[in-house]
Amino acid sequence: MKIIIAPDSFKESLSALEAAEAIERGFKSVFPGADYRKLPVADGGEGTVQSLVDATNGRIIEQVVTGPLGEPVRAFFGMMGDGRTAVIEMAAASGLHLVPVDKRNPLITTTRGTGELIGAALDAGAERLIIGIGGSATNDGGAGMIQALGGRLLDNSGSEIGPGGGALSQLASIDVSGLDSRLRNVKLEVACDVDNPLTGPKGATAVFGPQKGATADMLDVLDQNVSHFADMAEKALGSTFRDTEGAGAAGGLGWSLLTYLQADLKRGIDIVLEAVDFESIVQDADLVITGEGRIDSQTVHGKTPIGVAKAAKSYDVPVIGIAGSISRDSNAVYQHGIDALFSIVPGAVPLEDAFEHAAEYMERTARDIAASIKLAKTMFLI
């Protein structure tokens, strides 16, 4: 019996690999001779680097870069086991969690550190880049990233404009002749699960600006500035992606990656499953087990369990979902490939207890699931 174990992380308690290991222990206590394949995965958000490194026996590389407020921060990226695919979470360099609440101001926060991480990945020999762009603190349209990679964004005096979305109003010309030439030979895939355009009422600023510290007065300024950046890019490069779905992701970083780096924007879970070669592994599987911290009505919108389940169903492989908590409105997942759901929490326990004993609860739940399968095989002579 071949069993694939492909969970996402359980936030604040288990990494995807730790969750997979606990599930394996539980199943092995009932089916010790089964063929187990652990594939810790993610949906392109937090934990994607760790999951892909763990799944491919890769490594984490630390790098000091420019933080959102211009200060040095210790960030990281992953190099997958093939030695040529780098995985970057832009939040590691330019994330909202790096900015104290009282200092959040997208007029001044920058994506420069994200560009520096990309440069470091190229220095490490990357030929393919996977970039997750969730959790940003920025609304600069990716200007800082472009500057870090050698592009020049100039004001009327020929000087580089400053950091942040506020400085974009000073932009008078764009020079990409110095953009890192290695980028021309790199395949760049961006994990993007939002469909917002760059500007307008559904754009980067209007939808995501407030959570990054933008006041009502800032919103119009930022939207106008990012729109100006797009106008200038269209004049300089002859192309525009401002209305492309996902252009507004990460304060316009999605647009910049499309416009300047010719990136492909895809659903995060699709990129991750392709990176771990999930399709070839699942074809002859007997069972797939997936899961994440919470399964609810939002799980069907591009989350890991549904991505895994849909891939498995292409080959008629049954799928079991395991979660820390399961909401009352989670039934939609049954129409998207998951056959059964189980919660690991043994009754009404304090949240702290659930986090602290998550591995124990996971292993026990997995053992009980395996025992139920064995019992069914015995009773119904399957």
Curated annotation (Swiss-Prot):
Belongs to the glycerate kinase type-1 family. SUPFAM superfamilies: Glycerate kinase I. It comes from Bacillus subtilis (strain 168). NCBIfam families: glycerate kinase. Transmembrane segments: none annotated. GO terms for molecular function: ATP binding; glycerate 2-kinase activity; glycerate kinase activity. Gene3D superfamilies: Glycerate kinase, domain 1, Glycerate kinase, domain 2. It is an enzyme of class 2 (transferase). Its EC number is 2.7.1.31. One of its GO terms (biological process) is organic acid phosphorylation. Pfam families: Gly_kinase. Keywords: ATP-binding, Kinase, Nucleotide-binding, Transferase. This is Glycerate kinase. It catalyses: (R)-glycerate + ATP = (2R)-3-phosphoglycerate + ADP + H(+). InterPro entries: Glyc_kinase_flavodox-like_fold, Glycerate_kinase, Glycerate_kinase_RE-like, Glycerate_kinase_sf.
